[in-house]
Amino acid sequence: MSNIVDTAIEAIVAREILDSRGRPTIEAEVHLLSGAVGLAQVPSGASTGTFEAHELRDKDKSRYGGKGVLKAVHNVNEVLAPKLIDLDAINQELIDRTMIALDGSGNKSNLGANAILAVSLAAARAGAASLGIPLYRYLGGPLANLLPVPLMNVINGGAHAANNVDFQEFMIVPVGATSFREALRWGAEVFATLSEVLHDKGLLTGVGDEGGFAPNLESNQVALELLVAAIEKAGYKPGEQVALALDVAASEFYKEGQYVYDGRPHAPTEFIDYLGQLVDQYPIVSIEDGLHEEDWQNWQLLTQKVGSRVQLVGDDLFVTNATRLQKGIQEKAGNAILIKLNQIGSLTETLETIDLGTRNGFRSVISHRSGETEDTTIADLAVATRAGQIKTGSLCRSERVAKYNRLLRIEDELGDRAVYAGAVGLGPK
């Protein structure tokens, strides 16, 4: 059992670093009296929900085009650190509630969600290090043994790529694998085969922010056809072994009550019918942000139409916020929630939102952001919470692969206790 003297916070240090897009982000270290240290880095999104917690940027055009985070770094070093020194790192909720109270706003706009989250995650890592246990075990206890099904973003569009594709992500989902290691191999083989399929058709094989290919395509259906072709060419059965998933990111092309895709506006009911047709025609198991983040009435209609056949994930809709998730539960809008740590800005609030969803039959998908770092916290979080699903990009770009490799290590550590979510029917449905 830990001694509070040993696990007391001795020092907190933050610095400005770069994310995978070459933009500044914040890194924090939490040092304990025992000598244990926790290090955490915070990601940043491109397609952001209106209701996300506030990411504090400097807006000084003379540095990084105004995207610097020196204000957030200052807030950690000069505002948060003095109030957190001597607190017990094991008491995660006390640390997080103290920071939230110091900020005093409803969306962390005073000190910055990026500042608060960096310290929150670093404190958790320091706590785990002080006990000599991995982060997933520290957060999840002895039941943390479920390896997630990866939703692998292999064709990028929308805000994640400089192409003409409307939907933001087209994903492959190795639901039929028996282990995470096998699932990762299947995904990597399909990804490599997709490169060949694109090349044979004279399409570009450059990649977007999340490591997926970003070709110009005639329609969203063409992207789905390419994925089915790649799955089959790689030697797998579409749907049975490797399924498909979409991140529509519909808020990005919602204009004046209409959904503008394929070059023209469509009424919400027409768009819902279109999504239903895609579910009928392709082995799709999950659709994320199928409608605008404030289009609650039509979210209900979409859920009534296809919610029994496919997972409907709220990202911009819920923004990892328990209050918005509660509204979705009450209104029967969607049936799953995307979990992004920096949307809410603390580990405690993230875990509370996951718990709320679980208690009400909503599945959780633990997710990265398009602007990532080498930080692998979300891999441990997925196992700790038994979420059963993770989104962390494609099968290239080291900031994406780092999370997959972390999950491989966790699976090895767990040994015979490791269970792959897809093998026991706990992946997306």
From Swiss-Prot:
Q: Where does (2R)-2-phosphoglycerate bind?
A: 168, 340, 369-370, 391
Looking up Pfam families in the UniProt record yields: Enolase_C, Enolase_N
Q: Which reaction does it catalyse?
A: (2R)-2-phosphoglycerate = phosphoenolpyruvate + H2O
The cofactor(s) it depends on are: Mg(2+)
Q: Which GO terms describe its cellular component?
A: cell surface; extracellular region; phosphopyruvate hydratase complex
Could you name the active-site residues? 210, 340
Keywords on this record? Cytoplasm, Glycolysis, Lyase, Magnesium, Metal-binding, Secreted
Q: What is its EC number?
A: 4.2.1.11
Residues at which Mg(2+) binds: 247, 288, 315
Q: Name one GO biological process term.
A: glycolytic process
Q: What is its main location?
A: cytoplasm
Subcellular compartments: Cytoplasm; Secreted; Cell surface
Report the cofactor remark: Binds a second Mg(2+) ion via substrate during catalysis.
Keyword field contains Transcription: no
InterPro entries, from UniProt?
A: Enolase (IPR000941), Enolase-like_C_sf (IPR036849), Enolase-like_N (IPR029017), Enolase_C (IPR020810), Enolase_CS (IPR020809), Enolase_N (IPR020811)
Drop me one GO molecular function for this one: phosphopyruvate hydratase activity
- Functional pathway: Carbohydrate degradation; glycolysis; pyruvate from D-glyceraldehyde 3-phosphate: step 4/5
Q: Which family does it belong to?
A: Belongs to the enolase family.
Function text: Catalyzes the reversible conversion of 2-phosphoglycerate (2-PG) into phosphoenolpyruvate (PEP). It is essential for the degradation of carbohydrates via glycolysis.
Protein name, as recorded: Enolase
